[in-house]
Structure formats: structure tokens, C-alpha cells
Amino acid sequence: AIGETAKDLKAEMIVMGTHGMKGAQKLFGSKALKVVVSSRIPFLVVQGKPAKTKIDTILLPIDFKRENKEKANWIYYLSRNFGSRFIILKSNARDKGFKRKILSNIKYVETFLKGHDIAYEIVTASGNESFKKEIVSFAKTHDADLILIMATRDIRWVDYMLGAPEQYILANPYNLPVMCMNPRPAKLSSGFRAAGGN
């Protein structure tokens, strides 16, 4: 119903509030999470009152999934509307295949940012902890105002996602705002596979 209402209103995003970690965990039960991942409209999830009124710095995690390239339109939107700068956190993968895909995603996003004169910097994750945890801790230590992530493409994995990286980031312990976008259906996504581009 939320997604349909937002579509009828031609909303550009859905803002959803929670009350701390427990509220976030309750929110992302199977039914509500299905709403989030099935909506074509991005969700902006907030756990409390923002520390600032501006979105100056946005953390943009990039891993091996091809869906990362779909963030481009929202990078442009956020930059133009909020004047935001982006910190690209590059996943520190050891697998050669993953490294190749990560570099491809980085090159694509970097070309887009340069082409639209958007301020950014690239930082490689340390790899000392899981990428999902490093995303959250990095955002906290670097005062990011927003984390921009993609949801898992295949809606059939909604129950699995209760323990997936997206769930941890959305319900992060630092109450950081997170914008969650959903990949386009496979048939609309330039040949991207429904399983997440692996």
C-alpha cells in the first residue's frame, strides 16, 4: 500500500522513521521489508532526529554487484538538490573476479561523477571487518550525513535478507540515515541478472 500510494502521488522518495535499533528491527520484519524491497521508489530510513539539516556528505559503498551502477541517477539528484559531496567506499575484495567487477563499477561511477562535476573522493575499505560493518563505522567516523545503498535484486530472497547486509545497514547502531534504492527488474536493467549480477 505504501509503494502504491507513493506511486499514485508521484513521490520521488518515501521517508520512513523508526525508533532506534528495536524499532528498526521491528520495521524490517518480513512484511515491511517486502514493502521496502518491492518498491520502485527509494526509501529514506531515519531512526531519529538528524544531527544536521543539510546533507553535505554522502557515503557511497561500492562492491562487485552490477547494480551499483544504477545509483548514478540518484547521485545526480542528491548532488543537484543538496550540493552533496560523495565518499566512495570501495570494497576490499581478495578474489580476482570480484576485484575486476569492483574496478569496473568504480570506473563507471567515477566517470559519471567527473562528467557532472560532482565532488567526490575514493577510499578503499581496510578489510579488517565485514564490508557492511565497515560501511557503518566509516560513515560514523567520517560524519557522513547519509549512506546510499542498493537492495538485493531478487524479491524471493526477502526472508533471507533479514540477516543480509542491507538489514544491518538500515538498522545501524549509530542511527545514521540510510537511503535504500531497489534495482530495476532484470528485463529493464541492460542485461543485469536477477540474482545480483554475480
Residue ranges: model-predicted function:
Residues 1, 128-132:
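Charged docking surfaces used in two-component/phosphorelay signaling
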Residues 25, 68, 128-129, 162:
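A conditional alpha-helix N-cap/helix-loop micro-motif detector
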Residues 38-39, 49-89, 95-116, 141, ...:
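Short acidic/Ser/Thr-enriched loop-to-helix initiation segments
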